[in-house]
Amino acid sequence: MERAAKKEAVEALNEVFKTTGVAVVAHYSGLTVAQMQKLRMQMKQAGASVKVSKNRLAKIALEGTDVVAIGSLLKGPTVIATSNDPVAAPKVAVEFAKTNESFVILGGSMGKTVLNVDSVKALASLPSLDELRGKLVGLLVAPATKIAQLSTAPAAKLARVVQAYASKSEAA
């Protein structure tokens, strides 16, 4: 790799690390190309991304970012999964590790907080931001729905009484 290409790679990685909400580091030794493509696809669908680069270049790119602490995890063949959503990358990484023994999570970072393997797994078990937003909207809409049901209930009861009276009159 030429010096200019290395500089470009470091700058690109640095931008990714500056804007990311969470980063997960894992060993991927022994994964097939098809498995790596599957991982990349799953990450992309979840709104996350996967980066494989030389550890030395990644350590340089980490300087001046919040996730600089993961530099100590970059030993051997490592992959770095990043996402803005604090749950997306850990969730996909943990699920992928369950089905692929060659994919071993080493740890990660959420902002300036260093995460060990258990912390990454705990983060993966949380609901995503979209799920939380859906629950919040449901909670906000529920009272309005109940009020609408209560306001239409008397009219519905009156209509049923009139219908019953009309049915009774026809039968007589």
UniProtKB/Swiss-Prot annotation:
The keyword Ribosomal protein applies. One of its GO terms (molecular function) is structural constituent of ribosome. PANTHER family: 39S RIBOSOMAL PROTEIN L10, MITOCHONDRIAL. It comes from Nitrobacter hamburgensis (strain DSM 10229 / NCIMB 13809 / X14). Pfam families: Ribosomal_L10 (PF00466). Belongs to the universal ribosomal protein uL10 family. Part of the ribosomal stalk of the 50S ribosomal subunit. The N-terminus interacts with L11 and the large rRNA to form the base of the stalk. The C-terminus forms an elongated spine to which L12 dimers bind in a sequential fashion forming a multimeric L10(L12)X complex. Forms part of the ribosomal stalk, playing a central role in the interaction of the ribosome with GTP-bound translation factors. GO terms for biological process: translation. This is Large ribosomal subunit protein uL10. The keyword Transcription regulation does not apply.
